[in-house]
């Protein structure tokens, strides 16, 4: 079974459920239970229907996502670059080493010596 494609494995599932000898799901105490039974074909149909619906939803989201424009055209990118170059930097330029900024810290805390 290692050489089968995933699609053929998926189609093999109902066959295995039907031929594999699975009995319908039944209650343990049949005498006083009015439960309905679920055949393997119905169970396989539910599972396959769920898988198909999940794949269809994923494909719909993928294709609808491709239809939405991203809004990053060439003209918009050029104006964005221009806006970035026009804005002023919020950072200060480095001014070299200044010893007077922290010189008073050593005199205030002598217990660190």
From Swiss-Prot:
State the membrane topology.
Single-pass type I membrane protein
Transmembrane regions listed in the UniProt entry = 41-61
Q: How is it modified after translation?
A: Following ligand binding by associated receptors, tyrosine phosphorylated in the ITAM domain which leads to activation of additional tyrosine kinases and subsequent cell activation.
Signal sequence, renumbered to the chain: 1-27
Record topological domains on the Extracellular side: 28-40
Q: Where does this protein have compositionally biased stretches of type Polar residues?
A: 87-113
Question: What's in the keyword line of the UniProt record?
Answer: Calcium, Cell membrane, Disulfide bond, Immunity, Membrane, Metal-binding, Phosphoprotein, Signal, Transmembrane, Transmembrane helix
Relate the protein's function as given in its record: Adapter protein which non-covalently associates with activating receptors found on the surface of a variety of immune cells to mediate signaling and cell activation following ligand binding by the receptors. TYROBP is tyrosine-phosphorylated in the ITAM domain following ligand binding by the associated receptors which leads to activation of additional tyrosine kinases and subsequent cell activation. Also has an inhibitory role in some cells. Non-covalently associates with activating receptors of the CD300 family to mediate cell activation.
Q: What family name appears in the similarity comment? A: Belongs to the TYROBP family.
According to UniProt, the name of this protein is: TYRO protein tyrosine kinase-binding protein
